[in-house]
Amino acid sequence: MNKAILSFQNVTTMLTVTLINTLLAVTLMAAAQAAYAQAECTNRGDLDVLYCDENKDLVADTPKDAKRHKNPSTLVFTYTPVEDPAVYENIFKPFTDYLGKCTGKRVVFYQVQSNAAEIEAMRSGRLHVGGFSTGPTNYAVNLAGAVPFAVKGGEKEWQGYNVYMIVKKDSPYQKIADLKGKKVAHVQPSSNSGNLAPRALFPALGLIPDQDYKVLYSGKHDNSIMGVGAGDYDAAPVASDVFKRMAARGQIKAEDFRIIWSSETFPTSSFAYAHDLEPKLRDTLLKCFYDYRFPAEMRKAFDGADRFYPITYQKDWAIVRKVAEGGGEKFNSAAYENLKKKEAEALAAKQAQKK
């Protein structure tokens, strides 16, 4: 046989063996880390096996092993994709510029296109701090080691929002039960205002999602709102703060819609850091957030909020967890995989409509 062919086969064999050994080593390391985590953790609660909650505050503890602490030269920040991510990159620019000076690190804004992508980014270590929508915050805590610490707010309280059920102003619908058999847009499977809360609260009002109407996922709150305005949907449950911001920007006219139902108040998006940040960096980051006061353009964008108001997941997200549990929602790995599948299907359906 030709020596060149033999040489090529030998090289190929060596590369294959090396690849197999590498994959085996990675697999064994991951298994060892999981086993180590299980052996060292006395309480995990609802958290993924990668995390521990020994103080029972419902969020991941900082790793005991200092070798696992992260102190990146560049901090990656993002904000929930409730609307166009590019809009929020511009809105947060004064803050990210400040955060860079405050921490002494380069800060970049990472645009995410879905809640699942944002959660995955923190779980994989690519995201260090970010704003998570109200519902997805639960997944971020349990499956990505996110530690919520703030909500937009004022001097005395955090900023909340309501779930609005909106219809066109000239539609015949006057109450929730009138929407049986109609086209109702939900936002995303993980959205509190756009899916979880409606599923938990609507049955008592005479309307059962997926039974009295087929749930149509729009992908984002602005898609639902614009869709109702355009007549693509008969109604949609949306976050009141998004609706008000779109009206304030002139993207919609509030008078073109009617609100036929409004929920109790929920906290708006949480800001959370990765659980494995080096403690000194974490404390610096928290101080930077809490000391910051929003400039005029940010106050306008966020309905008058002027700061990051301190919260805890255990206390301030209790109402969100209660509503989700009332609707049968779980925030575990199986539910998350189902969430990713539904979000991917919703995105594909939306893209197909545009063609």
Show which residues each predicted segment covers.
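Short helices/loops that flank or line small-molecule/ion binding pockets
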Residues: A116-G130, L143, A177, H221-D241
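Short beta-strand-to-loop elements that line the ligand-binding cleft
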Residues: R106-Q113, Q211-K220, R258-W261
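Periplasmic-binding protein-like
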Residues: T80-P81, E155-Y164, Q251-F289, R299-I319
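N-terminal secretory signal peptides that target proteins for export/translocation
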Residues: M1-V17
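Ligand-binding "clamshell"
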Residues: A140-K152, M246-I260
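N-terminal hydrophobic or amphipathic helices and topogenic motifs
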Residues: A35-A117, R299-K355
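Bilobed "Venus flytrap"/periplasmic-binding protein-like clamshell domains
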Residues: F77-G100, T134-G135, E155-M226, Y233, ...
